[in-house]
Amino acid sequence: KEAQFIIENKTTTVPREISLTKKEYKINKKLKEGIVLLNKIAKKLRQERITKGSILFNKKEVGFVLNKEKEPIGTKIKETKESNNLVEEYMLLANKEVAEIFSKKKNKKNVYRVHDLPNEEKLISLERIIKKLGYNYRFDNMNNMHKNINKLLLEISAAPEKNLIDTLVIRSMSKAKYNTKNIGHFGLSFKKYTHFTSPIRRYLDIIVHRNLQRILLGTTTKGDKTLEEKCFYLSEREDLATKAERSSIKFMQVKYMSSKINKQFVGTISGIMERGIFVEINKNKCEGFIKIKDLPNDYFVFKEKEYLMLGRHTKEEYRLGDEVLVKVGGVDEHKKRIDLLLIEKL
């Protein structure tokens, strides 16, 4: 039931302080019992969501270890804990339920978080690329598209090329955005979804709160004329924020690798284009670029259909997922670029 309440917090904790897989808890017994019960329900919600087709992306996020001067001296993989999943499930449930309330108000505009179907051409390209990596899946049927994507993500969960394929699948998806017209959320497999709550506070959440409050109080919704404009603007700002985040990560990668000039690393080919090859270093997940002119022992050409780099005389091939030994040739902090030199294909 929807209603206005005041929540009084009795304690404050964060997911990293709660280890749901261990017997030791840093919280009192009563709170522990409540969290364990909530977690049981969250697991059922999660399983139900997966059964209905929700896609579970689990791409590894990389963070940086900083010294006192805030300079990167190491990298670390951000761990997703069971307690993070607990919070996520109730957040998704709240967002879904508020969208359900909005959908019943047919004569009033409200805000939805929508995610369109994937681009057909990108899915065909994804099928072709993963087939060359040894995975045979089709994504041309809406009835089993969610299921096949999840099967692929599950199959690669322990594979060396996991991070690469995760990235390729994410790139094949449409961008989620805000809209007053509900078309559903493909990734979550929800017919109705909005952004009512999150670990961060977004302005869009506040718009949703105001609209929900007006519905609960029975007052007239104001500002409908500007709602579509706000949705478009906030979707644009979100894109800019995402680009800024990626740029900051790349900048930190370059700063970190600036102390690794002439050192050798094992990496995986993560991208191929006419100008050269992208390689993600396995150890620290930093990505660098090998210029096509720097590929040794032959003149190489990019074969777009096969998505590979081919030596004109030696017929040497470089494909996505190939492991290579590279040397850090240099960095450019201004251009946020790591230049790599190929030593050999492994």
PLM regions: where:
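Conserved, carboxylate-rich catalytic/transport cores that coordinate ions
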Residues: 1-346
